[in-house]
Design a protein with these regions (language model features):
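Catalytic Walker B motif of ABC-type/P-loop ATPase nucleotide-binding domains
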Residues: 51-54
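Conserved ABC ATPase signature
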Residues: 26-30
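Helical segment within the ABC ATPase nucleotide-binding domain
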Residues: 66-78
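Conserved ABC ATPase "signature" region
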Residues: 2-22
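Conserved H-loop
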Residues: 80-86
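Conserved catalytic motifs of ABC-family nucleotide-binding domains
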Residues: 47
Length: 140
């Protein structure tokens, strides 16, 4: 990518992740949430079809978590980016994901369609409790 084009794209991504007003600040002064968004911009500059996020909100303050979740949801729903989102926070998973895999010791216990849960007026936590607290039957 030519320098001018790279700079333009970088500026666009910084704006997209909400850091355009932080450009003069050294990255060492960024909060954990800001660093997560900067890392996301770094990945997005490569135009991926899929991104893998492993516990992306860990260490981020509650306000920053909500902001980051909204950004991920926007990338997935509006931009059509495939996001593999690994988290122990069911509320975050429910906001971001279309399908959820429940794993234990590296084994898939269930693959859940979030639209189906909504139709049944169930919460992801109900399914989670079924498998992990009640010893529910595994679906392989």
């Amino acid at each position: 990518i030519p320098d001018k084009e790279a700079k333009t794209k970088a500026m666009e991504l910084m704006k997209r992740v909400g850091l355009e007003d932080q450009l003069a600040k050294k990255t060492g002064k960024y909060s954990r949430g800001m660093r997560q968004r900067l890392g996301l911009a770094d990945v997005l500059i490569k135009n991926p079809e899929i991104i893998i996020l492993d516990e992306p909100t860990s260490g981020i303050d509650p306000a920053g978590v909500q902001e980051f979740i909204e950004l991920i949801r926007w990338l997935s729903k509006e931009e059509g980016l495939t996001v593999l989102f690994s988290s122990h926070h069911l509320d975050q998973v429910q906001k971001v994901c279309d399908r959820v895999g429940l794993f234990s010791n590296g084994q898939l216990l269930a693959l859940i369609d979030m639209a189906e849960l909504k139709d049944k007026k169930q919460e992801l936590s109900d399914i989670y409790n079924h498998y992990f607290e009640e010893g529910g039957e595994r679906h392989e």
